[in-house]
Regions:
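Primary mode marks residue(s) on the alpha4-beta5-alpha5 output face of response regulator receiver
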Residues: 21-46, 54-172
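Functionally constrained cores in energy, signaling, and assembly domains
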Residues: 6, 17, 40
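Hydrophobic h-region of N-terminal signal peptides that target proteins for export
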Residues: 11-18
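A composition/secondary-structure signal for short, hydrophobic, low-basic-content segments
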Residues: 2, 18-19
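Sec-dependent signal peptide recognition
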Residues: 3-10
Length: 172
């Protein structure tokens, strides 16, 4: 009986569920000691550039995101751009670096991420953000590899995407 209870608890603790989303894998769960401070829905583009990779083959590489952040009523409350960086309507910004990722449940969509903050600007909502999750992604993958050849070197392509971003800050 104890082993059944332990197995059940392991399954429950291996993923976190946030209201209104699919199950969030433990690999991208917000660190302990952080609280959710803002949810935003992003709509925009992932911008890719066709260039030669390290092995000499042509490939699409991510240049930058370009998206608006919306509140639950659909109003624009900020922007997401190269860095990656998120800017809130109060002027505060947070930049970060992906620290973990999992494949999206939708194979035609970019991965879900956990991003660790690396820098801040301003004193507003994003001033103390320490982690950002990107979940519920739709679209955003690069064009087909066949569309990136030597003749297209330097060409940019914008792919539509949407995602939910959850911003976390220390609980204290």
């Amino acid at each position: 009986m104890m082993r059944v209870l332990q197995a059940t608890m392991l399954m429950v603790c291996s993923a976190v569920t946030v209201a209104g989303t699919k199950q969030i894998p433990a690999a991208i769960a917000a660190p302990a000691g952080e609280k959710l401070v803002l949810k935003a829905h992003a709509t925009g583009f992932q911008i890719y550039t066709c260039n030669a990779g390290a092995d000499g083959t042509q490939q699409w590489t991510l240049k930058a995101p370009e998206a608006d952040l919306h509140n639950k009523k659909g109003a624009v409350i900020g922007h997401h751009f190269a860095g990656p960086t998120w800017k809130y309507k109060d002027g505060s910004e947070v930049s970060g670096k992906a620290s973990a990722h999992v494949d999206s449940p939708d194979p035609d969509s970019i991965p879900w991420l956990l991003v660790s903050a690396t820098g801040h600007t301003g004193d507003g909502v994003f001033a103390k953000v320490s982690s950002i999750q990107r979940i519920n992604t739709k679209g955003g993958k690069p064009p087909a590899a066949s569309q990136c050849d030597a003749a297209k070197t330097g060409t940019e392509s914008k792919t539509k995407y949407s995602a939910d971003y959850y911003f976390y800050a220390p609980s204290k």
